[in-house]
C-alpha cells in the first residue's frame, strides 16, 4: 500500500479529469438533438456528424498517441499530461456559455480538433505513470484500481448530471477540468525521475526503440517521433504484444460502435432522455467500480490476467448483444449490470502489454496500444454510423433497430477469440532495436 499511497495524487487527478469529461455525456445527446433537430426523437444529421467527429478524432489520435507516449518517456509524464488537460477545458467552456446552434457548431469543431490530442491520452499517460512506480507482479491490480477510479468518477459525474440543468452541467464540468489541471501541476510528482534514479539494471531498461545518443538536444524531439517502422518493430518484438494489439483494435472497434449508436438507439426506441441516460451510466459505473476495486485484485492473482481478459471480453460481447435485442425499456438496465465482469478487459490488456517492455519503454508501449485502438476509431464510424442511421430511419431494410450494436458485438467476439490464444509469457527485456527505422538484433 505504500507505493499505492504514493500514487494518490495521480488517482485524484484521474478522478477529477474523468469527472469533468464523463458528466457531460448524458447531456450532450439532448444538446446535440436540440441544436440540430429540435423537437425530434430521430436525427440522422446528428448521427452522421458524430460519426465524422469520431473518424477525425481517430485519425488524429492514431498519430498523437504513440507520439505523446514517446515524448513522455523523454520529457516526463507530468509534462505531457499538461497539454491534453488544458485543451479539454476549451470546448467545455463554449457549451458552458451557450448551447445554441452556432455555439454548438463552434464546440463541435474545437472538440474535434482538441480531442485529437486529448482523447485517451490522459489514461495512456496515467498507465505509464503507474508502470513507472509499480512492480510487474502488482501492476494488473493497480491498473484495475486506476480504471476503478475512472469508473467511480463516471458514477459521480453521471449522478451530478441527474440533478443539474444542461447549462449547469457544462459550467460545473469546465470548472472541474480547470481544478484538475491546477491540482495536477501543483501536487503530482514527476515519475520519470523514479525510473532513472532508482538505478534499474541496464539490461532491464534497454529501449526497444533506440535513440541516437549523439543527437543534439535541440533536435532530440524529432528522434522521439515514432515512425510506422518503429511501430512495426515494436509489434514484431513480441508475439504477446502483437496479440494484445489485435485485441485492442477489435475491442475499440466494438466499443466505439456501441457508444456511437447506443444513446441514439435508446432515444429512438424507448424515448430516453438525459435522466435515463444518466441512470443507465450510473448502474454501469457502480458495477464497474465495485468489480475493479474489489473483485479484480483477487481474481487477477487467482485466475491470471490472460484468462481474466477473456472473461471480460466475453461478457462485453454478451452485453452488446443484449442491448441490440432489447424488447423493453428495462432490458438496457439489465444489460448494464454486465459491466460487473466486462470491465476486466482493459486493465488486463494494458498490463499484458506493459510486461513486454522495459521501464523506459512504458510510454511507447501504451502509446502504441492506444494508437492502434485509435485506428479502430477511424474505421468504426465508417461502418457503424451509416448502419445506425439506416436502421433507425423510417424505412430500414428490415426491423432491427439494434442491428449496428449487434455488429459491434461481433467485433468483440473476434477480440474474444484472439484473447483465448494469448499465453502467459516472461517479460521481454529486449528483442529488437530500431536504427533509422530498421529492426536489428541488439
Short names for language-model regions:
Residues 15, 91, 102-121, 330-346:
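Hydrophobic core of transmembrane alpha-helices in multi-pass small-molecule transporters
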Residues 162-177, 386-412:
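A membrane-interface helix-boundary motif in multi-pass transporters
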Residues 82, 86-102, 314-327:
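C-terminal ends and interior cores of transmembrane alpha-helices
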Residues 1-7, 190-247, 252, 268-269, ...:
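Juxtamembrane intracellular "pre-TM" segments in multi-pass secondary transporters
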Residues 177-189, 323, 406-442:
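Multi-pass alpha-helical transporter architecture, strongest
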Residues 61, 138-162, 177, 372-383:
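Glycine-rich segments within core transmembrane alpha-helices of 12-TM secondary carriers
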Residues 108-150:
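Cytoplasmic helix-loop-helix junction between adjacent transmembrane helices
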Residues 27-47, 260-277:
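Short amphipathic helix-loop junctions that connect adjacent transmembrane helices
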Amino acid at each position: 500500500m505504500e507505493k499505492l499511497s504514493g500514487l494518490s495524487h495521480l488517482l485524484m487527478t484521474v478522478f477529477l479529469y474523468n469527472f469533468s469529461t464523463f458528466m457531460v455525456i448524458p447531456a450532450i445527446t439532448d444538446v446535440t438533438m436540440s441544436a440540430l433537430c429540435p423537437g425530434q426523437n430521430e436525427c440522422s444529421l446528428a448521427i452522421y456528424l458524430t460519426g465524422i467527429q469520431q473518424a477525425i478524432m481517430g485519425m488524429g489520435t492514431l498519430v498523437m498517441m504513440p507520439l505523446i507516449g514517446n515524448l513522455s518517456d523523454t520529457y516526463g509524464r507530468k509534462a505531457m499530461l499538461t497539454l491534453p488537460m488544458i485543451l479539454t477545458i476549451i470546448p467545455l467552456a463554449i457549451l458552458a456559455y451557450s448551447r445554441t446552434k452556432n455555439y454548438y457548431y463552434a464546440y463541435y469543431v474545437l472538440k474535434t480538433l482538441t480531442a485529437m490530442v486529448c482523447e485517451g491520452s490522459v489514461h495512456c499517460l496515467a498507465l505509464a505513470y503507474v508502470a513507472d512506480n509499480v512492480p510487474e507482479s502488482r501492476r494488473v491490480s493497480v491498473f484495475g484500481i486506476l480504471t476503478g477510479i475512472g469508473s467511480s468518477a463516471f458514477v459521480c459525474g453521471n449522478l451530478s448530471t441527474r440533478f443539474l440543468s444542461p447549462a449547469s452541467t457544462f459550467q460545473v464540468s469546465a470548472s472541474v477540468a480547470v481544478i484538475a489541471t491546477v491540482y495536477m501541476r501543483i501536487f503530482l510528482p514527476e515519475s520519470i525521475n523514479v525510473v532513472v534514479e532508482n538505478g534499474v539494471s541496464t539490461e532491464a531498461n534497454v529501449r526497444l526503440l533506440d535513440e541516437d545518443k549523439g543527437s543534439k538536444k535541440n533536435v532530440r524531439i524529432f528522434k522521439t517521433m515514432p515512425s510506422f517502422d518503429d511501430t512495426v518493430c515494436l509489434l514484431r518484438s513480441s508475439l504477446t504484444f502483437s496479440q494484445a494489439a489485435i485485441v485492442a483494435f477489435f475491442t475499440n472497434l466494438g466499443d466505439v460502435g456501441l457508444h456511437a449508436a447506443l444513446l441514439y438507439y435508446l432515444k429512438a426506441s424507448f424515448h430516453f432522455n438525459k435522466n435515463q441516460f444518466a441512470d443507465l451510466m450510473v448502474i454501469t459505473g457502480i458495477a464497474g467500480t465495485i468489480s475493479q476495486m474489489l473483485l479484480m485484485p483477487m481474481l487477477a492473482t487467482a485466475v491470471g490476467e490472460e484468462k481474466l481478459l477473456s472473461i471480460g471480453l466475453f461478457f462485453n460481447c454478451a452485453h452488446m448483444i443484449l442491448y441490440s435485442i432489447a424488447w423493453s425499456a428495462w432490458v438496457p438496465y439489465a444489460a448494464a449490470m454486465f459491466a460487473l465482469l466486462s470491465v476486466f478487459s482493459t486493465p488486463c490488456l494494458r498490463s499484458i502489454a506493459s510486461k513486454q517492455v522495459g521501464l523506459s519503454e512504458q510510454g511507447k508501449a501504451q502509446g502504441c496500444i492506444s494508437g492502434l485502438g485509435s485506428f479502430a476509431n477511424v474505421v468504426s464510424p465508417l461502418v457503424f454510423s451509416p448502419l445506425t442511421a439506416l436502421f433507425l430511419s423510417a424505412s430500414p431494410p428490415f426491423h432491427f433497430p439494434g442491428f449496428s450494436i449487434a455488429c459491434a458485438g461481433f467485433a468483440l467476439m473476434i477480440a474474444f477469440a484472439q484473447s483465448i490464444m494469448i499465453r502467459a509469457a516472461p517479460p521481454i527485456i529486449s528483442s529488437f532495436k530500431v536504427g533509422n527505422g530498421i529492426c536489428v538484433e541488439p
